[in-house]
Amino acid sequence: MSVKPNYSLKPYNTFGVDYACSELISVETKSELIRICSKLFAEDKPYLVLGGGSNILLTENYLGTVVQVCSKGIVCHEDDEFYYLSVEAGEEWHQLVEYCLATAMPGLENLALIPGTVGAAPIQNIGAYGVEFMDVCDWVEFLDLRDGALTRYKQEECQFGYRESIFKGALKGISVITGVGIKLAKKWRPNLSYGPLKRFENTGVTPKEIFDCICSTRNEKLPDPRLIGNAGSFFKNPIISFSKFQELIGKHPSLVGYPLPDGFVKLAAGWLIDNAGLKGASVGDAAVHEQQALVLINRGQASGKDILKLALKVIETIKIQFGVTLEAEPRVIGAYGEKELIDD
């Protein structure tokens, strides 16, 4: 465990914005994570649990303790039908995908190259290319800060939805994820529902081929946060009623939407932003990415407030042009913790 006072968080957020925290504590084990978070909670001190920093937007210096989760460890067992993995919260998600592929336990390849740690995956139910975390989740282990109990919720208890979970709802602020259980079927079935993967239908595709295709597609579409600051897709794909979709498709015949089982339609937020003429739009050094409209980038010297103002500009424009409200994926962090996506 290391403790660093008044420390810059620039290396710890993928937007690369330069704000500091009052104290940065890096914890290497589950027991350290439990002890530190329990102590901060009991003393009613402000703190922020940080994984890879790929789903936050800092807008000012944080006046509290940042707890960086660095706990590592993967334990595997199996039965006749499944592989079961117990994974510590500080493991890198993409490295877990690579590990499973290298050890002949496929099933995560569609989720390749998603930045961040394993402990963050359940919070917003990460997903890409036809697969979500909930599809491979067996359980989530968390510290209940109210009573100090280490608790496991089965998949069905986690209230997963589109970029949602109980950890963003009822357990927000009173739980710290310490590990997750992954369940992968031994009878592997490729998920080829997403565009670039459809070419593999009826080809006897391998997990490695899907992995390579996903990595290639993401590298073509999404900027590398090590080179250009970003948090991946900044906006959720909005879900609207079928009647609203019919109204919009009448005005915009090329509108991209995906029918959902409950009669609603999920719109492609990237299409909305692109067709609103917002690709390349900027505020200061923050900009909408030219290749992928869902992504907001830091061209080098953007502040968190620049990115926030740009996000609000995009939301306002889409609301005016299409009557649809976009929601942000990243958490906005101010001086005293998470706050609403509003201009301050």
Swiss-Prot record:
Concerning InterPro entries, the annotation shows: FAD-bd_PCMH, FAD-bd_PCMH-like_sf, FAD-bd_PCMH_sub1, FAD-bd_PCMH_sub2, MurB, MurB_C, MurB_C_sf, Oxid_FAD_bind_N
Active-site residue list: 163, 233, 329
Q: What is this protein called?
A: UDP-N-acetylenolpyruvoylglucosamine reductase
Q: Residue limits of the FAD-binding PCMH-type domain?
A: 17-187
**The species this protein was found in:** Shewanella sediminis (strain HAW-EB3)
Protein location: Cytoplasm
What taxonomic lineage is listed for the species of origin?
Bacteria, Pseudomonadati, Pseudomonadota, Gammaproteobacteria, Alteromonadales
Tell me the HAMAP family matching this sequence.
MurB (MF_00037)
As cofactor, the record names:
FAD
**Pathway(s) per entry:** Cell wall biogenesis; peptidoglycan biosynthesis
Question: Could you tell me the keywords of this UniProt record?
Answer: Cell cycle, Cell division, Cell shape, Cell wall biogenesis/degradation, Cytoplasm, FAD, Flavoprotein, NADP, Oxidoreductase, Peptidoglycan synthesis
